[in-house]
Amino acid sequence: YWWFLVSLLGALLVFLLFVQGGNSLLFTLGRTHEERTMLVNSTGRKWEFTFTTLVTFGGAFFASFPLFYSTSFGGAYWLWMIILFTFVLQAVSYEFQSKLGNILGKRTYQWFLVINGVVGPLLLGGAVATFFTGSNFLVNKGNMGNELMPVISSWANGWHGLDALTNPWNLVLGFAVLFLARILGNLYFINNIRDKELIPHCRCQLITDTIPFLILFLAFVIHTLLLSLIHI
């Protein structure tokens, strides 16, 4: 039951990453102020869904696998904190870029959206990749009966999750998720925006993002399958 729920929320989260994919394309597709405004207005009506699903996804992990949740979210907190910070940055950018008295300027907040669109999916993919490549944590269930030291899981180093980015295969899946988000963002813009000049750019960018996604994703899948065969 819990595996089904977590898988469902994970799939829904990936689907909703079209918002982040659209954010990463803001200056790639939006070559004029008017085009960037159309892109921001298009994704600005949907960003809450991704944020809510991300939080629900974490809650489902807590309910289903509390030891994993406490170890990953507590031990690797720098990685997860950066992910959450980029999503908070997204919320602030959508809300304040057009407000009166905006001292940072609209373009600054648009670059914040780009940061969210690139860093968010990249680190999410890297974090998920650790489920397959492993993480540097220790589990000592003998501490369950120790009142002076009740901690049963702890991170093995002081990097607290940032060490996951030193594994190239974590980055491979991270970039695969990033390009997948950009694919979904392009498809969303094609179906949501009616502009004769912008849509052709979206179609060309769709092909540009599909090729590296297929290469990276297939490479990660093949690598993971080969590792599983070696350990049989």
Tell me the role of every PLM-derived stretch.
Residues Y1-F49, V55-F57:
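N-terminal signal-anchor module of multipass membrane proteins
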Residues L12-L25, A60-F62, F85-F96:
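Central hydrophobic cores of alpha-helical transmembrane segments in multi-pass inner-membrane proteins
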Residues T210-I222:
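Hydrophobic core of alpha-helical transmembrane segments in multi-pass integral membrane proteins
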